Amino acid sequence: HAALISRLKIMAELDISEKRMPQDGRISLRIGGRAVDVRVSTLPSAHGERAVLRILDKGDANKFTLESLGMSGDSLSRFKRLLRQPHGIVLVTGPTGSGKTTTLYAGLSTVDAATTNVLTVEDPVEYELIGQTQVNAKIELTFAKALRAILRQDPDVIMIGEIRDFETAQIAVQASLTGHLVLATLHTNDAPSAVTRLTDMGIEPFLLSSSLLGVLGQRLVRKLCVHCKRQDGQGKWHPVGCTECGMSGYKGRTGVYELMVADDEIRGLIHAQAAEAKLFEIAQLNGMKTMREDGDRLVGEGVTSLEEVLRVTRE
């Protein structure tokens, strides 16, 4: 075990003599002609160090399209409409590992790179795209510092890997108010709670109501294996398990989404500092389908199972 951890730390260019402190690194590999990035995180424990690896396919960002993400036709057309706006802020929200960055890159693929200056600030850079800046805590290049520098590079579209603090949120909102389209991710449970998170960080409601275009909440669900899924007497599909899917009944993943578009009514509620529940209620009345409802659509289409949707969504 210790030898394996040491080998991983050498490959990730970590300090192999330091066993008392957590460390983060990365390994760049080429497997089958494809560039693969492995993020390595080590943590001391009672019985030696433990390591977790996260594998990223560092391919071309343009391989992602919004059409391939599994959105409903209505959400897809509304989301594309937001991305065509000349300025404002579009947020993608969800827990860690819910596909937020992939959605942002798919959104960027709709932008005409020949006529639009697209710049990104990420930690770390996940997919290849011209005009990326990687945050580096070791040299104190924070999201906020990188964003300030990027604003002097005449960007049309700015993508922020994650809004983590007030300073980053403030610059993002100001940038969206001064003629830039800003795409960013945030960690919240659903689309309307992104508004509460930003105001809790210290963003003035009148600034947020003026700049916000919309919020996309999302989760990832496993797709039923097409080789072995079974339909019951009521027409519902269930996982079975075969050699194709490693006996799990599932193969591949897709997203469930909810899109809150900031129309005049939603902007008014944000400005008036309305409760999260009220935002949710009005967003639904104005056409927002919840993640649970979107999941029900996938269940009806036989893409995933009801158990999967219930696992990742809440009432």
Question: Residues of each region from the PLM?
Answer:
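Short, flexible helix-loop junctions that flank or precede catalytic/ligand sites
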Residues: 1-315
